[in-house]
């Protein structure tokens, strides 16, 4: 062990400052990078939503699986300090690689704005993510445990508060990064073409990771450093394997039972190691139900964000984007951690209630379950406002009259009259085999035109009409609300030439006469656009402004030449109404989930450290983090296998599962007895001094020093 430094500040070791700043910078780096991944996969690498989501969750799961490797390296080979430094270098390289992979101009040899060697970008991205997963996962179990190592005996209160400060640093880094990196992403940059600036958005987190490494190394002279005690995980595995094999060899009634199944390893392994493994397995047993909490918690970045895309973000004069709602959790954490630590827990203690670690974790699981009940209620309210889209054997159609006369349209069992430059109020729904014929006529004009078109099942269509025998059927291409709360806009031109429209950096090319462009998607707010055409009178403007777009809407803009003066005019028609349920209704579910996180996650970190033997602290921290990985895997399984017709039903399922797990955990915790590993090991040290090292120790089973139920 390194020399213990006497320098301190407010009762805390000064070295803690470097560890907390390191964690803040590292979490900024990780969450800033992670916030961009799905959009990077979809918009830069060109993957579809399903593949992007699968790779994203696989990466997150890998980040929480690699802590096992980090714990093995720290406890068996390099020690915590050298492990953190070594894997932080790997981490920084990974961040730099993914930043380079996002440079469009790296392979854009023809300067068309698209990379010519996409497989190279994919390969670099995967290498970068693999290095990041190894780096961030490898240091996870080491940093918090290394911070706990800096405290002396008798500083239990300061150590417990350190874990709260440590968790506060995590969420402060997360909060700032999720605000800043999306702003960096929307900047335009590039040598040959202006693109979303992923290199800058990834580059800043890479720079912060380098800062984290430098800050951590600067504190080197102040740290208490414990030397690794051999391949502890290997010893544990061998001891457990020997105990199981020895027990089955002696399963006959002729052999007396032993107090604990691990006592069957006493023929080969010393009592100290067996006792330490008993401590570890008791804690690991409590970890079994925990992944269910993380299965719910990590859906903030997926299901809850998708829920926000079906809501409106206008709160007074403030406008919130759907992916910004994730910052609510980080903001609440920064506020609530000190309040809970300095106010709530002391008040509970003054009331005489023994609010132990496992009781706190049980309450946290219950609160997370209730958060999903609230999410289900919000989803029910959202579902009431969502438009109905056609099923697989249905067709939806509306009529848009872009002519100068009223038009009558005859559907099977339904007739509508549409005034000039107007549309039907809603989409009409028909079974595919029901829509056999559509007839169109114009009042005052002889004859009826029959629309000959084969409608595609499961899609919306628009019937454009502008006179007798003049029509066109357009497949809309929108069978759901626009993603991420954006707004879809398409143009229909009645001009007699091919035109181009430029709107907020996007181009609608070659829009032909009396046809519809594809939808392009824009965030909320008013958008400027320019119509390039020769069919415009002198002194007339070709520059226009859209209406003030809300969230999740879609519109058709019809362009025509005004008969009175030859100037262009544009009329807006609503295809999908904007969202009406406000994102503010998500705040209660975020509040409940954050309350659950504060009393569950912070407590879990401290519990894992306090109950671990000195040589197995990183192992138990890795076990704690492994529960997060398994939780992400549960989400993947349920998402793939569930296929719920209603999203609220999936929320209720998750809430019910966690509630059941919460009850099971409470029962398990009731039978757990708290121990002080340091005092137990001190007893072993004292006994070995009396009897001599290597002699048989009288402790045949672990007797707890202090006992507290749950």
Swiss-Prot record:
It catalyses: a dipeptide(out) + H(+)(out) = a dipeptide(in) + H(+)(in); an L-amino acid tripeptide(out) + H(+)(out) = an L-amino acid tripeptide(in) + H(+)(in); L-alanyl-L-lysine(out) + H(+)(out) = L-alanyl-L-lysine(in) + H(+)(in); L-alanyl-L-proline(out) + H(+)(out) = L-alanyl-L-proline(in) + H(+)(in). InterPro entries: MFS_trans_sf, Oligopep_transport, POT_fam, PTR2_symporter_CS. SUPFAM superfamilies: MFS general substrate transporter (SSF103473). Glycans are attached at residues 415, 439, 510, 532, 539. Belongs to the major facilitator superfamily. Proton-dependent oligopeptide transporter (POT/PTR) (TC 2.A.17) family. Residues 383-586 are annotated as: Extracellular domain (ECD). This is Solute carrier family 15 member 1. Residues 698-710 have a biased composition (Polar residues). Residues 22-53, 104-118, 183-198, 298-327, 383-586, 643-647 are extracellular. Gene3D superfamilies: MFS general substrate transporter like domains (1.20.1250.20). It comes from the Eukaryota. The extracellular domain (ECD) region specifically binds trypsin. Signal peptide: none annotated. The chain crosses the membrane at residues 1-21, 54-74, 83-103, 119-139, 162-182, 199-219, 277-297, 328-348, 362-382, 587-607, 622-642, 648-668. Pfam families: PTR2. Residues 75-82, 140-161, 220-276, 349-361, 608-621, 669-710 are cytoplasmic. GO terms for molecular function: channel inhibitor activity; dipeptide transmembrane transporter activity; peptide:proton symporter activity; proton-dependent oligopeptide secondary active transmembrane transporter activity; tripeptide transmembrane transporter activity. Keywords: Cell membrane, Glycoprotein, Membrane, Peptide transport, Protein transport, Symport, Transmembrane, Transmembrane helix, Transport. It is a multi-pass membrane protein. Electrogenic proton-coupled amino-acid transporter that transports oligopeptides of 2 to 4 amino acids with a preference for dipeptides. Transports neutral and monovalently charged peptides with a proton to peptide stoichiometry of 1:1 or 2:1. Primarily responsible for the absorption of dietary di- and tripeptides from the small intestinal lumen. Mediates transepithelial transport of muramyl and N-formylated bacterial dipeptides contributing to recognition of pathogenic bacteria by the mucosal immune system. Residues 687-710 are annotated as: Disordered. The gene is Slc15a1. It is found in: Apical cell membrane. GO terms for cellular component: apical plasma membrane; brush border; membrane; plasma membrane. One of its GO terms (biological process) is oligopeptide transport. Interacts (via extracellular domain region) with trypsin.
């Amino acid at each position: 062990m390194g020399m213990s430094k006497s320098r301190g500040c407010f009762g805390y070791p000064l070295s803690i400052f470097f560890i907390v700043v390191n964690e803040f910078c590292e979490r900024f780096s990780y969450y800033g990078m992670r916030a961009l991944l799905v959009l990077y996969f979809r918009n830069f690498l060109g993957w579809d939503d399903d593949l992007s989501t699968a790779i994203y969750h696989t990466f997150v799961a890998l980040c929480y699986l690699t802590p096992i490797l980090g714990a093995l390296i720290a406890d068996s080979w390099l020690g915590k300090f050298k492990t953190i430094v070594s894997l932080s270098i790997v981490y920084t390289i990974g961040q730099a690689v993914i930043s380079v992979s996002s440079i469009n101009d790296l392979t854009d040899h023809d300067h068309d704005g698209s990379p010519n060697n996409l497989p190279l970008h994919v390969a670099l991205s995967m290498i970068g993510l693999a290095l990041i997963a190894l780096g961030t996962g490898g240091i996870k179990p080491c940093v918090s445990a290394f911070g706990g190592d800096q405290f002396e005996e008798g500083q239990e209160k300061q150590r417990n508060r350190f874990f709260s400060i440590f968790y506060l640093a995590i969420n402060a880094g997360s909060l700032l990064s999720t605000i800043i990196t999306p702003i960096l992403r929307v900047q335009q940059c590039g040598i040959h073409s202006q693109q979303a600036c992923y290199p800058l958005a990834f580059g800043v987190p890479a720079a912060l990771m380098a800062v984290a490494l430098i800050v951590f190394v600067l504190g080197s002279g102040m740290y208490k450093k414990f030397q690794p005690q051999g391949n502890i995980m290997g010893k544990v595995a061998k001891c457990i394997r020997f105990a199981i094999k020895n027990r089955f060899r002696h399963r006959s009634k002729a052999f007396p039972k032993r107090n604990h199944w691990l006592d069957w390893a006493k023929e080969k392994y010393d009592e100290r190691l067996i006792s330490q493994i008993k401590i570890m397995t008791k804690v690991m047993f409590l970890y079994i139900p925990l992944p269910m909490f993380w299965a719910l918690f990590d859906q903030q970045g997926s299901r809850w964000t998708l829920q926000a895309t079906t809501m409106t973000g206008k709160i007074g004069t403030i406008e919130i984007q759907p992916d910004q709602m994730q910052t609510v959790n980080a903001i609440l954490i920064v506020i609530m951690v000190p309040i809970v630590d300095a106010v709530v827990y002391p008040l509970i203690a003054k009331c005489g209630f023994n609010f132990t670690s496992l009781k706190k974790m049980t309450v946290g699981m219950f609160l997370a379950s209730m958060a999903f009940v609230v999410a289900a209620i919000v989803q029910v309210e959202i579902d009431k406002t969502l438009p109905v889209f056609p099923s697989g054997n249905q067709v939806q159609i509306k009529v848009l009259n872009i002519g100068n006369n009223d038009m009558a349209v005859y559907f099977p069992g339904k007739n509508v009259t549409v005034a000039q430059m107007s549309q039907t109020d809603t989409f009409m729904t028909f079974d595919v085999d029901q829509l056999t014929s559509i007839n169109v006529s114009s009042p005052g004009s002889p004859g009826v035109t029959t629309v000959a078109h084969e409608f595609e099942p499961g899609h919306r269509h628009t019937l454009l009409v502008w006179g007798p025998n003049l029509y066109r059927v357009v497949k809309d291409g929108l069978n759901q609300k626009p993603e991420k709360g954006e707004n879809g806009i398409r143009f229909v031109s009645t001009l007699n030439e091919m035109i181009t429209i430029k709107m907020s950096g996007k181009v609608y090319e070659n829009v032909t006469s009396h046809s519809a462009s594809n939808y392009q998607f824009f965030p909320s707010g008013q958008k400027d656009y320019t119509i390039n055409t020769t069919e415009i009178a002198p002194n007339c403007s070709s520059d226009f402004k859209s209406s003030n777009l809300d969230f999740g809407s879609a519109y058709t803009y019809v362009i025509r030449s005004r008969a009175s003066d030859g100037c262009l005019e544009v009329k807006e028609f609503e295809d999908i109404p904007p969202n009406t349920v406000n994102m503010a209704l998500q705040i209660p579910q975020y509040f409940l989930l954050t309350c659950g996180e504060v009393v569950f996650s912070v407590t879990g970190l401290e519990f894992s450290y306090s109950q671990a033997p000195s040589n197995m602290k990183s192992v138990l921290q890795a076990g704690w983090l492994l529960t997060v990985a398994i939780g992400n895997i549960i989400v993947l399984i349920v998402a793939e296998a569930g296929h719920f017709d209603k999203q609220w039903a999936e929320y209720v399922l998750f809430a019910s599962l966690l509630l059941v797990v919460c009850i099971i955990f409470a029962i398990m915790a009731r039978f757990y007895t708290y121990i002080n590993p340091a005092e137990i090991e001190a007893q072993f040290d004292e006994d070995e001094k009396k009897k001599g090292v290597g002699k048989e120790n009288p402790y045949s089973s672990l007797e707890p020093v202090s006992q507290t139920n749950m």
